């Protein structure tokens, strides 16, 4: 992969209110989709006006550049005179560098759309973007007018990048899973690890279009962030994640710990299970401790609550912080990624264990996905997700291993987590 080293040019933007159907057609290929119904937010990004990619060593500098406060010149007046669009940079950060199976997805990639359509606070807006050096008010106004005409007059959907369907799943072997769990427990008993999150894959033959899958997920999981990132060549990375990595506005940060899982019918039992409470406490302590190094203040509730989803329940603790004046998104990502909810405790030892023994090309799974813009970001941990390409949807399923875990119970937990996408595939 070639890393972009050129400075990121300032952007020019133009926005307006709009109307039309929820999923309009005629706007070109949909490159990114983001829906969080609980917050009333829905985003669709079309085309690319600008893209930047980086290797792991360039992540901090890239995030700092994307989130700088003066990154956009609005040609229709001051930014505070209108609702600000999410982002507008959209993209993802891989858990580990994607290999051949992830062709079309760079390890770190963010892009500005040519056209952004978003619903929020009960209203719809549209914005167009271009590098400032290439933009004029007339050219952006023409693009904006054309987009508004398409929004007003066309119906249908534009998320038909790759087909998916439910069928008999091809899964990683249970014997290999059991061996990996046993090895993890050996390292835990030797005190090398306290927790490690191991993952496996499930392959499902392709069938219905991705748009139907996304629409089912956002209806079934309004508390989650349903996402779609189009890869080069038409591959798709889709999911509906329950875990926010960060919501950043200026220096105010909101994040969360999500660890400990059960069937919805057993949700309240999570508050009485020592194994799940212990696992959750380690995640909370790690996140809060990492944030204290870059924050003026960190607020953590005294005890967790339960978050119930349609197919699974989790222990949940919201965490908020006010960053030091010199800290921003780059420092937050450096401090928290990967969290113990997807790596383990201690973090470095857990990630090393996974690299040596998991033998799974995680790619974007368990990485970060979302939107970045001037002095703000909305990023989630990419969970409950699948890579869709070549007629196959590969689902990624993980479970946290701690003292007291068993291979059988953790396998069943991953089966439980698979239901979100499998049910959506069947409904689609």
Predicted regions and their residues:
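Contiguous alpha-helical scaffold segments within structured protein domains
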Residues: 1-20, 26-31, 36-61, 142-182, ...
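A short, Trp-centered hydrophobic/proline-enriched beta-strand micro-motif
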Residues: 29-36, 88-90, 194-196, 224-230
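An anion-binding catalytic pocket shared by soluble metabolic enzymes
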Residues: 43-50, 84, 103-106, 115, ...
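A residue-level signal for conserved active-site and pocket-lining positions in enzyme catalytic cores
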Residues: 91, 117, 191, 246, ...
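Short, solvent-exposed aromatic-acidic interface loops
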Residues: 127-135, 258-263, 399-402
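A glycine-rich phosphate-binding loop feature that marks nucleotide/adenosyl-phosphate handling sites
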Residues: 200-203, 231-237, 287-288, 304-312, ...
């Amino acid at each position: 992969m070639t890393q972009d080293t050129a400075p990121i040019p300032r952007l020019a933007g133009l926005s307006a209110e709009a109307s039309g159907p929820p999923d309009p057609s005629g706007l070109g290929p949909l490159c990114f989709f983001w829906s969080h119904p609980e917050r009333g937010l829905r985003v669709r990004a079309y085309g690319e006006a600008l893209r930047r990619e980086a290797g792991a060593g360039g992540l901090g500098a890239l995030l700092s550049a994307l989130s700088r406060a003066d990154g956009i010149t609005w040609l229709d007046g001051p930014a505070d005179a209108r609702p600000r669009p999410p982002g507008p940079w959209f993209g993802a950060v891989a858990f580990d560098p994607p290999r051949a199976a992830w062709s079309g997805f760079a390890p770190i990639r963010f892009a500005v759309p040519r056209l952004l359509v978003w619903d929020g606070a009960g209203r719809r807006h549209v914005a167009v973007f271009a590098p400032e050096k290439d933009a004029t008010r007339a050219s952006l106004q023409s693009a904006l007018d054309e987009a508004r005409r398409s929004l007003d007059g066309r119906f249908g959907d534009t998320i038909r990048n790759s087909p998916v369907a439910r069928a008999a799943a091809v899964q990683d072997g249970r014997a290999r899973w059991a061996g990996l769990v046993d090895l993890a427990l050996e390292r835990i008993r030797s005190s090398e690890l306290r927790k490690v999150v191991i993952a496996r894959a499930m392959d499902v033959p392709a069938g219905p279009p991705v748009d139907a899958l996304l629409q089912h997920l956002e209806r079934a999981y309004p508390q989650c962030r349903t996402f779609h990132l189009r890869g080069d060549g038409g591959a798709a990375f889709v999911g509906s994640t329950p875990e926010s990595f960060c919501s950043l506005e200026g220096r105010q940060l909101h994040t969360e710990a999500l660890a400990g899982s059960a069937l919805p019918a057993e949700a309240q039992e999570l508050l009485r299970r020592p194994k799940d409470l212990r696992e959750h406490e380690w995640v909370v302590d790690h996140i809060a401790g990492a944030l204290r190094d870059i924050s003026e203040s960190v607020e953590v509730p005294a005890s967790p609550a339960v978050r119930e989803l349609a197919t699974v329940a989790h222990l949940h603790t919201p965490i908020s912080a006010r960053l030091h004046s010199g800290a921003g998104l780059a420092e937050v990502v450096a401090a928290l990624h990967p969290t113990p909810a997807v790596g383990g405790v201690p973090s470095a030892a857990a990630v090393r264990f996974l690299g040596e023994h998991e033998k799974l090309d995680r790619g974007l799974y368990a990485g970060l996905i979302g939107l970045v813009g001037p002095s703000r970001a909305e990023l989630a941990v990419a969970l409950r997700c699948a890579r869709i390409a070549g007629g196959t949807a590969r689902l990624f399923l993980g479970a946290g291993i701690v003292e007291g875990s068993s291979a059988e119970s953790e396998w069943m937990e991953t089966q439980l987590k698979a239901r979100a996408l499998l049910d959506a595939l069947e409904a689609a």
